[in-house]
Design a protein with these regions (language model features):
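Glycine/tyrosine- and acidic-biased, solvent-exposed loop/turn segments at the edges of beta-strands
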Residues: 119-190
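Charge-dense, helix-prone N-terminal extensions
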Residues: 1-132, 180
Length: 190
């Protein structure tokens, strides 16, 4: 699969030069802010994902460029900051010839990441928590509102830090602690 950036380079070439450059700079800045976000193509648009969740889509139109932060409530959270932009429930329009401002882009995408994190834990099923760079902080399963089954905890750089099992919310069996290079540092029995 081609990277989003190469797709974006090709995709945004269909627009006038300044418009394509503004879109490309915006998506590259989002990738810089969230280096662990996965590149994807969704609805025919360059997209950044965090796990199975969409962080943001990027697209150009005849009279504006748009960010689609994958949640209508993001626009509501930043009503004051977005007052100079045309905003609808699912999109934020910005000028054809200027990239979206980095400080505001960061605020919007961090808010979206917080929404993704807040969608967990579930009483039953998968739990995932993400760092602000888009990398996984921890992942496991819940059963009847308690941690149950295999769990993994990661460092900010994405390397595994600890893994083991929970049974009814209690650590169980062998837990392994890893050095940043992946080497096993110790094992603990519960």
């Amino acid at each position: 699969m081609a990277s989003t950036t190469s797709f974006a380079d090709t995709h945004f070439k269909k627009y006038p030069k300044e418009q394509g450059a503004a879109l490309l700079k915006t998506i590259k800045e989002a990738e810089r802010l969230f280096p662990k976000a996965e590149r994807a193509i969704s609805y025919g648009m360059p997209t950044l994902k965090i796990g199975d969740d969409y962080l943001c889509h990027f697209e150009g139109f005849k009279k504006h460029n748009s960010l689609f932060p994958s949640s209508g409530s993001i626009s509501e959270l930043f009503e004051k900051e977005l007052s100079m932009y045309e905003v609808s429930k699912g999109t934020i329009h910005f000028p054809l010839d200027k990239p979206f401002p980095t400080p505001l882009l960061k605020k919007l995408l961090l808010a979206r990441l917080n929404q993704i994190n807040e969608s967990y834990p579930k009483k039953n099923g998968t739990y995932i928590q993400y760092y602000k760079n888009g990398g996984i902080q921890s992942e496991g399963k819940y059963k009847a509102g308690t941690m149950n089954g295999a769990w993994k905890f990661y460092r900010l750089d994405g390397s595994i830090m600890r893994s083991g099992f929970f049974k009814n919310g209690q650590q169980s069996g062998t837990w392994t602690t890893y050095a940043a290079n992946g080497r096993v540092v110790k094992t603990t029995e519960f």
